[in-house]
Amino acid sequence: DVYYPGPTEVKEFYMSVLLDREKGRNVIVYSTEGGMDIEHVAEHTPEKIHREVIDPRVGLQGFQTRKIAFNLGLSGEAFKQMTKFVASLYKAYEGIDASMFEINPLFKTSDDKIIAVDAKVTLDGNGLFRHPDYEAMRDKTEEDPTEVEADEAGLNFVKLDGNVGCMVNGAGLAMATMDIIKLSGGNPANFLDVGGT
């Protein structure tokens, strides 16, 4: 149960900003089905999940925040508050170098306030050099041990689900190698860039 010291009638939404690695773009994923496991919603009622892809050349635009508020069925003051919330959420996502920023549930109260009740944030390890204060919050027990070991050795390593290992010199070569593996019917087991070491 969540305590909210205001009007008790609420509508719950789901919203997250994350990096779509296949598209190479940030995307806002949102749904009217907040307060529940979004994977369950995706499996049983995928039509209730919306995606708004953000063009990195121009960033989040006003028409996109309005589209999100409209798709959530909001109007009046709640519509305005949601557009402001979406813009602020995206600004925070970029500002802290996150790779995922999830709000679930996101409340709309009967007095048209938008309230983030719970949040999960995943920081992009490649942006940590801009935020030295984040290191104190890092919990390496929550990370893949192989990735932690590679990081401590100064290597850029990402574990994947495939069966073919990739060790390359440079991110561009890594991406091309992974594409060739996929085209040949395999799946990359990792991304290991040893460039500069």
Predicted feature locations:
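ATP-dependent carboxylate/acyl-activation modules
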Residues: 1-103, 107-197
